[in-house]
Every structure is written in C-alpha cells, then in structure tokens.
Amino acid sequence: MNFMLRRNGGQFQKFGFFIRCNSTESFYSKAILGLKKDLKQAMLAKDDLKKTTIRNMLSTIKNKEIDAKDTKFDEFTLFGIYSKLINQRKDSISDYLKNNREDLAGKEEQELKLIQTYLDSLPIASPQEIDTKVEKFLNDLKEKEGTVPMKDVFSKVDWNTLTKEWKASQSMIKSSIVSKYKNIF
C-alpha cells in the first residue's frame, strides 16, 4: 500500500491528517515559540503592556543571538537575559520613585512581574538550591582532602556533569563557590 507523506514543519501530512513527529527541540526554542504565541495572544487581546514587554524580551534575546553567533543557547542563557531585564526594571522603579513618577514606576512593576513569571517557568535550580548543593560539595571536599586552595576547588569540579545534574549554569555555580568558600575553608 502506497502512502503519500509530505513534510510540513515538524509534522507529516497523510491524506489530510497531521502526524506529529517526536521532536528533539531544545527548551530554548520551545521557550521562544511560547513567547511568540504569547505575543500573538497579547496582540489579539490588545494588551499593550504585555505586548511591549514580550517584544522587548524577544528583541533582547535576538540581539544576544546576533552578538554571540557561534554560541549554543539554552535555558541558562534565558535565565541570564531575564535576570538582566528584571534588574533593569528594578533600577528604573527606584529611579522613578526618586523622581515622584509613581505612574511610570507602576508600569515598570507590572513589566517586572510579567518577566518574573517567565523566569520562574525556566527549569533551573534556584540560587538557594545551588548554594545548598555547593555547601555540601565543599564540605565533602574538605572532609576528603582538608584545606584546598580555591583555584584547586575549580579544577576538582566536573562541569559537564554538575551543570546537568544541578540544573545550573557554570557561572551560577562558580559565583556560589566563591561566596561559600570563605565560610567553609
């Protein structure tokens, strides 16, 4: 029996029916698609605040992609971008409040909450979870080898395994090690 299959994006069409293929899309690309869908919904609902915030997020992500062409992007990249946008909003809010512009501060606060919801949806460990794991790692290292210089601590870390198991970026783990090292050693 001959079947006519035609590829249509991530789907195959067979006699007018779509068959979804098992895709291996990364979380990064799924998150971008989710942002674009949310942008479309905001445009249809005429929600200007959500629309401009999501456009700003997509623009920042695209600029990051252009700046770092050969870099692999993942959920940790999105975490960094979202965190940067949140910090910008916090700075703007404090500046607006200093200048008695509560209306603009309120708008920035709403944008911050929206970006925070996207940040919370990322499958990464919280800073508190990372700090707890780093403390345990450093205590185990101290028990095994005694006092270890900080430069040697970094060489004892298996970065590929640790970033996947802990669901944390290398930079997040490094900053946690630096802050916790002083307390343990």
Curated annotation (Swiss-Prot):
The annotated transit peptide is positioned at 1-22
Q: Reply yes or no: does the keyword Transit peptide apply.
A: yes
One GO cellular component term noted in the UniProt record for this chain: mitochondrion
Q: What is the superkingdom listed in this entry's lineage? A: Eukaryota
Check the record and name the Pfam families matching this protein.
YqeY
InterPro entries, per database record = Asn/Gln_tRNA_amidoTrase-B-like (IPR003789), YqeY/Aim41 (IPR019004), YqeY/Aim41_N (IPR042184)
Q: List the disulfide bonds.
A: none
What family does the database annotate? Belongs to the AIM41 family.
| Descriptive protein name | Altered inheritance of mitochondria protein 41, mitochondrial
Supply the source organism for this entry.
Answer: Vanderwaltozyma polyspora (strain ATCC 22028 / DSM 70294 / BCRC 21397 / CBS 2163 / NBRC 10782 / NRRL Y-8283 / UCD 57-17) (Kluyveromyces polysporus)
